[in-house]
């Protein structure tokens, strides 16, 4: 078992991570010494920690170059969880194409690089950057708002972003999303998440408002999410933690909306108490 662990956050996120009190309490019960540390605190000597765990560093999309440099610096002196290769894979949602090529069902997605015109499917659409977190700079548009969606794409392109265009699935308003949490590659627990994406606007906070609830995953949901985690494990190594967000597509099947390996909320507050203990165990050993 390790002796000392850094739980990595950022100043703006302090007090806003629902996982934090449950995770820290569970880690304390293992006997591990835990420090709550901002990732961009230059006074920190990361080599003093046996393990550094990314948790609520939610401002990284706005500081990506700095964050990337930090990943390598920490990884050079201690055990970073998840490792940089996994983090970098998950940073860019163009990984959805890789999942689709491997036969994992994904939300229908068109990737629009800077310099390319955007085209939209009939009906409502969602526009989001390929690199982002917490639904920041993501927005939904109605069937009569494609002009506004085009302007949104142009703004993201001007910032150098590849853009994802997805249909606004009929199931989203009624059912939301299902975050599926995996620890050491094995399914742990699930939740239900309903994200309030702005209508023809963008999120200007660390994350979009959410309404969350407990959820008992079905075998079909676990199968799809496990396929995504297995692909990552086979190609890059097994993530200590992973969250696969599922939605129901317009044919009624479950598909992957995203795979979060950077600093995902794990919805410990909506899971059985043993979930926090499982999380602490994989971090401590």
Regions found by a protein language model. Give the residues of each.
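Active-site nucleotide/adenylate-binding loops and adjacent lid/helix of ATP-dependent enzymes
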Residues: 2-9, 71-76, 85-175, 219-223, ...
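A short glycine-rich, hydrophobically flanked beta-strand micro-motif that places a catalytic Asp/Glu
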Residues: 35, 165-167, 237-250
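Phosphate-binding site of ATP-dependent enzymes
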Residues: 143-234, 255
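Short secondary-structure junctions
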Residues: 32, 104-105, 121-122, 234-240
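Conserved N-proximal alpha/beta basic substrate-recognition cap immediately N-terminal to
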Residues: 3-108, 113-114
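A short beta-strand motif that forms the metal-chelation/ATP-contact edge
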Residues: 49-54, 128, 179-182, 248, ...
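Glycine-rich phosphate/pyrophosphate-binding beta-alpha loops
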Residues: 58, 135, 196-198, 260-270
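C-terminal active-site "lid" helix and adjoining low-complexity regulatory extension at the edge
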Residues: 236-239, 248-285
């Amino acid at each position: 078992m390790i002796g000392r662990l850094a739980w990595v956050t950022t100043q703006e996120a302090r007090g806003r991570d629902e996982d934090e009190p449950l995770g820290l309490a569970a880690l304390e019960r293992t006997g591990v010494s835990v420090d709550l540390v901002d990732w961009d605190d230059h006074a920190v000597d990361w080599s003093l920690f046996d393990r550094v765990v990314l948790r609520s560093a939610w401002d990284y999309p706005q500081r990506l170059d700095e964050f990337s440099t930090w990943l390598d610096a920490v990884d050079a002196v201690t055990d970073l969880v998840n490792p940089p290769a996994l983090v970098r894979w998950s940073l860019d949602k163009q990984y959805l194409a890789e999942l689709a090529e491997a036969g994992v069902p994904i939300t229908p997605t068109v990737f629009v690089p800077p310099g390319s015109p955007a085209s939209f499917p009939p009906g409502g659409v969602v526009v989001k950057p390929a690199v982002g977190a917490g639904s920041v700079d993501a927005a939904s548009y109605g069937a009569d708002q494609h002009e506004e969606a085009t302007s949104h794409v142009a703004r993201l392109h001007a910032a150098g972003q590849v853009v994802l265009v997805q249909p606004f699935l009929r199931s989203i308003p009624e059912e939301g999303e299902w975050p599926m949490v995996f620890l050491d590659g094995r399914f742990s627990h699930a939740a239900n998440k309903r994200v309030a994406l702005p209508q023809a606007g963008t999120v200007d906070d660390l994350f979009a408002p959410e309404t969350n609830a407990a959820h008992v995953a079905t075998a079909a949901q676990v199968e799809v999410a496990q396929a995504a985690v297995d692909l990552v494990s086979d190609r890059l190594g097994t993530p200590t933690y992973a969250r696969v967000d599922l939605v129901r597509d317009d044919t009624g099947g479950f598909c992957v909306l995203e795979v979060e390996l950077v600093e995902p909320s794990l919805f410990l507050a909506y899971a059985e108490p043993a979930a926090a203990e499982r999380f602490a165990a994989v971090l401590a050993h």
